[in-house]
Amino acid sequence: MKKKLLLIVWFVGICLTAVASVPVVTWDKYSLIIDGRRVCPVMCEVHYSRIPAAEWQQEVRKMKEGGVTVIACYVFWNHIEENEGMFDWSGQRDLRTFLEVCQAEGLPVVLRVGPFCHGEVRCGGIPDWIFAKGCKVRSQDPVFLKYVERLYRQIFTQVQGLQWKDGGPVMACQFDNEYRGSGDYLMALKKMALGIGFDLPFYTRTGWPELSKPVPFGEMIPLYGDYADGFWERSIAETAGNYYKAFNFKAFRSSTAIATEQLGEQEEKLNEGDEQYPYFTCELGGGMMTAYHRRPYLYPEDAYSMAIVKLGSGSNLLGYYMYHGGTNPDGKTWLNEMQRTLATNYNDMPVKNYDFQAPLGEFGQKNPHYYMLRKLHLFMHDWGEQLAPMEAVFPCRQDIPKGDDSFLRWSVRSKDGSGFIFINNY
């Protein structure tokens, strides 16, 4: 009896220790808080289905060496259910094994579960066969949501046991992408995910464009982005669009230059209350793809100076898109990734290459901005706890015109008599 009692006490003790060892993740208007300590994470986008599975561990380690502390990745629907009802989680589509690699390397993961992702994938990742169902995609159409629920259930089979509460790496997930309709649709996706079993510390959405109807406060943290250039621009001028604004320190968190091929012209406007969320990004241009009609070349300083500007403007999570390039996987029929579809305004993209001029290229090569950004990431690692609660102040003009170099571009983040000065002369 005594032995049984001791065994029960020992078992309960192990269970309590396991539960207690899971870090508590919360957030407030400034930052993420892990076990009571403020952090300024560095999040990198990498698409596991665009990298051979045998290379995942070495590539994740490269990201970690670059100062990355969180992995973000799309789960492309048409990569796993190209043919209706035939899910493929094998080889480089094996999400569960990728998550286990991230867990082994101590890196949390933010899953971007769609159903629409974009990611320069055909129809944004929505499989061709969906369009034959006669439903309205990216809406609360019951037929569409029936197939989305099946998708989410499949994703959950890969995630089950690897959620944050289980001691796993999956910390958060993003619903849809670059959506401008009613927040009711995003809330329907979240309700569906929770009903299936997703139970994560927080959930996200892209903060651009403005939603026609906002989601209730606290349901999804909006994440923002900016790029130095965009292949999606219809113009072939050297400096088209308003990308120059990404290099100005400013209070406005969002960008009106992202995905203009599908979103069109956008106002500089956030949904009411969004300023009360922490300022996080998920799509700082680590590089840029090239299309047939527009082939921008990105310099290492483009990514580096943009990151400095976002940090100096108050961001407490730098998320890059992309940080690691890749190669589009082979399809079972004809997985045409050239983007010649209405969903993305007929951009003519490479069939296989997705190098993105990223810090880590298509084959894992370390490009110059990998090393440049690493220095900034190490600064965030060492000083993030002090930096996170510091408000951003802008002594300079926030609307410096395109090509005007007569103004010093700088900002200050400070609190209680100490702070940091950020300068961008690029």
Predicted regions and their residues:
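Bacterial N-terminal signal peptides
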Residues: L7-T17
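Conserved residues at the C-terminal ends of beta-strands
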Residues: E45-H47, Y74, D176, Y321-H324
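Aromatic-lined substrate-binding rim segments of carbohydrate-active enzymes
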Residues: W56-G124, D128, K190-G195
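Carbohydrate-binding surfaces of carbohydrate-active enzymes
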Residues: K133, F144-Q158, D166-Q174, R180-K190, ...
